[in-house]
Each structure stands twice: as structure tokens, then as C-alpha cells.
Amino acid sequence: MKKALIIGAGPAGLTAAYELLTKAMDIEVVVFEESDCFGGISKTVNYKGNRMDMGGHRFFSKIPEVNEWWDNMLPMQGAPTYDDIVLKREMPVHKGGPDPEKEDRVMLTRHRVSRILFDTKFYDYPISLKPETFKNFGVLTTLKVGFSYLGSMFHKLPEDNLENFYINCFGRKLYSMFFEYYTENLWGRHPSEIDASWGAQRTKGLSIMGILKDFFGKLFKVKNRKVNTSLIEEFKYPKLGPGQLWDVTAAEVEKLGGTIIKNAKVTKLHKNADNVLTSLTYEKDGQEFTMEGDYFISSMPVKDLVGGMNDVPAEPARIAKGLPYRDYMTLGVLVPKINLVNKTNIKTINNIVPDCWVYVQDRNVKLGRFQIYNNWSPYMIKDLEHTVWIGLEYFVNEGDEYWNMTEEEFAKIGVSEMVKLGLIDSPDVVLDVHMEKVKKAYPAYFDTYDEMDRLIEYLSGIENLYCVGRNGQHRYNNIDHSMVTSFEAVKNIISGTKDKKNIWSVNTEQEYHETSNNEDEKNQAEVD
């Protein structure tokens, strides 16, 4: 029996394992996971009964195969959630689906509310054409935004960097208000230094024109209109956070006979004289082990993959070594309440603001976003009625001053910024805090990234290596696109296809903007 060795037990790795075990019965599957949990950046951390979502993950896809896969692992709710019952909110339920009040293995339908906090005022994320928006802007700023956008329509800049891409989409004024500082805070680089392709993937074709179409489509109730995924108003979400999906998947993989080795860091991959991988070496419990395999599916960072491989030519080695990443830190803060006033028409427990997360556009703080876990799922919080569980999100570099902080030091900064933003009155109201860190959370689009095609060519030449997922391809994929790279890899393994173009082309800009015969099948998703 042939053996597939899969590096990483995140969305891409576990999807590949499950697909192989259900579609290729003659292949043994072994998964190596560096940490002690599943899901990668999509994991859920349980701290004293309060759960944290690393980065916030909405599940929304227009790829039928992905939706069917999710439904198989976590069936859609067949009865209301706790907060919908208490608040008498109407949300769709699926006949015959599990009751989230009685069962855990269930996917919920949740409201999408994300806003920008700018100059102490709330704005929709993405910006929408509502009276409140213009009221917040004031007459002068509204005029500046309008004329700035008109100027960008008639004078297009070359889209050779992210700054020009955003200015072409939104005009210089909106760019300076809502994109410039946030992007620099996120990546640690000014947008003028970042490749434009990141914007194309993450804004999903969104622009002022797209916002106008959405506005008038709602106004006149246009049927069958195409909805840009950055504008979706509902999404799926696992009852116990995104990590639950991957915990369930891991259990299914093991049930099907797959092996998962946790706390196993893959450090080396060994090629023979024919440029074919023969084995890998991993560290576990302070010891080194080597395992032979026939197929190697990697979701580990490309930089580490190539760095651990023997006999790599100088050029691909240099490109891989220069690939940049941004790391992530979050501080869970438990408080009795937050000061933000709910002025929306969406009911919530204790009338807290309904946002899943809020983008912070304030040059006086380091904080990039904060999540309100109560609104993702009522089952994420131990005491929903009496506490609010906030996740403060910071974008950092491994080894910098933030990354090296103790939890106490990090909490002091995070809580002080909550006070500065008016979220709480004093540090004294904080009931508890918890810090989490994620290495290489975001593959970045600068430095040697513009030479990525040459690295892809080299990796594709290793016939039994399949690179999948966000870090496996150094591409800012959403969960569904990461899964599709694994679908494609498994198809190639089963069919014996040597060409890897189908795997690497998932969520490329060209394919991303293609339109199928059925608009609802366009390959887009919103999972952040």
C-alpha cells in the first residue's frame, strides 16, 4: 500500500487527509501537526470556558462542493440558538437539522455585522451608502470623498502596488481614511510597498461602483443580483468556533484509519537523485524520526518547506528564504460590559453592539481589530448573560517588542488601549485576560513574493510534492480556497496527473474574477 504524508492539520491538511481516505482506499494516510491542536490559524482556544477564534472566520462559500463538505461535517441547525430564542429573532433553520441547544455537532446561521471605528464613530465595513455614513462624514468630507472618487475614475493609476489599487477602487480620500493606516498596521509596510494582488484577493472586486450596485439593488429589490462576498449579511459558523470543524474532521480521519501525529514538527524532506521525495524527518518529544512516503502534501510555510529540503538550487532557495510573513497576537479580555452603544435595529443579549468584529482606524493605538465573541456564537461564552468576551487583535513580527512581551505586559497595553478608545472606563473593570500567539498567520506580498512564479515552477517539478493551503502556497486564501487546493491535489494523486497547474491556479486573480454560468457558483468566499 502506498503512503501519503501530510504536513499540517489545518484546513488544507485535514481536508486532503479526509479526501484521500474516502476516495482512494489503497493509500495509507499520516498527518503531522506541529502543535497539540487542530485547525492552524482556524483553531479555537478554550480558556476557562470562554472560547477564542484566532482571527475571526466567517464560513461563506459559493463553491457547492465546499458547502456540501461543511454540511457533512457539521449539519445546519434545525432549531433556534439560545440568543435567538431569548430575543425572539427569526433566523433560518433547516428541517431535520440538529438542535444547537441539545447537540454540539451543528453549524449555525449568524448575522454578519462588521464595522469600522473611525474618529469615535461607526462606519459599515465595507463602507456603505447610508444616511448615517454621510452624517458621520459631514458635508465637507462627503464632497471630498465624492470628488476624489470621480478623479480616480478619470485618472487611473498603474496598479503596480496596493496603494494605487485602492486609490483606483475608492479614490484617494477614502483610501487615506480607511485603508492606508490600517494596511500599514496590518502588514508593517506602507501599501505602496505591497503587491496589488493582495488587494484583488481580499476586496473581492469591491469598489465604490460595487457598493453603488449593492445599494440600488437593495433599494429596488433587484432579483437574482450578484452579491459580492464582502457584502454578505449572513454566514455559517460552527457552534463552538471554527476549530470545532477541524476537531470533527480529525476525528473522522482517525475513524477512517488515518494516523495523526501531534506535537510533531517536520524539519527535513529528503529527495533522491531523480528529484523525487522519499521521506521526511520530524521532531517529537526531543527526538528525531524519519518516515518514508510516496506522496507528500504540504501545508507548511513554503519558506520552511524549501529550507528543510536537500539539494535545492540557489535561486529557488533564495526566493523561499526571502518570503515574508506577518504574525498575530490576540488578547482575550473578559469584562462585565462595554461602553459602545447599540444604535442598530439588531437585538442582542444585554443590548451590546451586534458586531462580530470591529476594524480600528485610529493612529493613536496599535490595536488593529477587536472581536466580540458573544456575537459569533452564544455558545462561545461561559456566562453570556453577565459578561462580554472581547478579542483584541494585533499584527506583529515574531521576535519584535510585542511578540516578546509577557502576558502581563501585553495585557497592560491592550487594556489601556480599550480605555483610550472608550470601550471601558478603567482597567479595574477587567475580570480576566488571556494571550495567544500565532506564527506566520499571514503570508505577505512583498520582498521576494514577486518572484513566486519561479519558485512555483521549481516546486511543481517535484512530481510527488503537492503544496496546498494558505501557507503551503504563500497565498492569502480563505478557508474554502484552501480546501479546494486539497481537493485538486487529491484528484491529481488519484488520476496520476503530473501537471500541478490546477492546484496552483485556485484563487488566482484571473480565476477569481471569472463568472460561471450560474453566478452563485463563482469561487468566492468571506472568511477572514
Place the predicted regions along the sequence by residue:
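Mid-domain catalytic core of redox enzymes
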Residues: K23, P238, K262-N404, E408-E409, ...
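Glycine-rich FAD pyrophosphate-binding loop
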Residues: L21-Y47
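N-terminal Rossmann-like FAD-binding beta1-loop-alpha1 element of flavoenzymes
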Residues: K2-V31
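Conserved Rossmann-like nucleotide-cofactor binding loop
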Residues: A12, C37, K303
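C-terminal lid/capping helical subdomain adjacent to the catalytic/cofactor pocket in oxidative enzymes
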Residues: M435-K439, Y445-D528
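Dinucleotide-binding Rossmann-like beta1-alpha1 core, especially the glycine-rich loop
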Residues: K48-S152, K204
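Conserved mid-domain beta->alpha element of the FAD-binding
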Residues: K156, D294, S298-L305, E401-F410, ...
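Active-site/ligand-binding neighborhood in enzyme catalytic cores
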Residues: P131-T133, F137-G138, T142-H270, T278, ...
